[in-house]
Regions:
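Post-transcriptional modification and biogenesis factors for structured RNAs
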Residues: 1-280
């Protein structure tokens, strides 16, 4: 289950942290982004390269993935790492995949849990008293989404499933774009945010119609110091469906990236909602 039934991707540059020098401040900003993604049910975070960047895409991916990982799996997936020093201090996202440990007698077939394949390749640590038996061999240390098929005090069986089949929001995935920030057939409606874009009120009716019919949406954001026209080219309008200005009457020099992300996600959710009355 995603934002208003749509699959949503946000695309952010690897310069989104350029205003911050300390590890603590960078981590806090990524924590805000992770929280907004979770609140609005974002499926994918795509990190694209900005030529003026400091090469922070790997760090960004690591922190965002750490925050999305259930707490009971973090030590298995992430070894001690100085770059994650402050990530553990951030409040947990508490999304549905971040389940608490439950007694085996309360575990029911049909439940979903996140897990990591153990060294034998056939069992999975899913945060329970005993490993879940997978029924087939998979790569050790691989993270899987598991559907419990049977459970008793002595044995738990499950099978790996695609998280898209789960009827509730299950978290976001993070990728570092190797090509264009605009790639991705799953998210064909592309909306770029820019202070040089069309005021949102001017395109809101047309945007609402397109959102209703779109199966997937990509929202693109620039870094604090410059816009998407400078990063992706002056022909940006030819590459995307919309270029919108979310704050046409802003009273600050620059809206922060995380503020733009929150505002855009709220707006998209509102416009795509079937409960929103028709515009007159």
């Amino acid at each position: 289950m995603t934002l208003a039934g749509k699959r949503i991707c946000i695309a952010i540059p690897d310069t989104i942290l350029e205003e911050h020098d300390s590890l603590r401040d960078k981590t806090i900003k990524l924590g805000q982004i992770a929280r907004y993604c979770s609140i609005f049910g974002i499926d994918s975070v795509r990190i694209f390269h900005d030529q003026r960047g400091r090469g922070e895409s790997r760090f960004m991916k690591k922190v965002l993935e750490y925050l999305e990982t259930p707490q009971y799996l973090r030590k298995r997936i992430f070894p001690l790492d100085e770059e994650l020093r402050f990530a553990g201090l951030l409040p947990p996202l508490r999304i549905p995949s971040h389940k608490a440990k439950v007694p085996l007698e309360r575990l029911r077939p049909g439940e979903y849990r996140e897990g990591v394949v153990l060294a034998d390749g056939f069992s999975v640590d899913a945060g329970l008293d005993i490993p879940v038996q997978l029924g087939r061999k998979d790569a050790p240390q691989k993270r899987l989404t598991i559907k419990i098929t049977s459970a008793s005090k002595s044995r738990v069986d499950g099978l790996a499933v695609d998280r898209r089949e789960i009827p509730v929001y299950w978290g976001y995935e993070v990728e570092v774009a190797t090509g264009s920030a605009l790639s991705g057939a799953d998210f064909p409606l592309r909306i770029a945010t820019s202070r040089h874009g069309d005021p949102i009120a001017r395109v809101i009716k047309e945007l609402r119609v397109d959102l209703r019919s779109a199966k997937g949406v990509t929202l693109l954001f620039g870094p604090p110091s410059r816009g998407l026209f400078e990063i992706l080219g002056k022909d940006l309008r030819d590459k995307v469906s919309y270029v919108v200005n979310l704050f046409p009457e802003q009273n600050v020099v620059t809206a922060r990236s995380e503020e733009a992300i929150f505002s855009a996600l709220y707006l998209i959710g509102l416009l795509a909602s079937p409960d929103l009355p028709p515009f007159t």
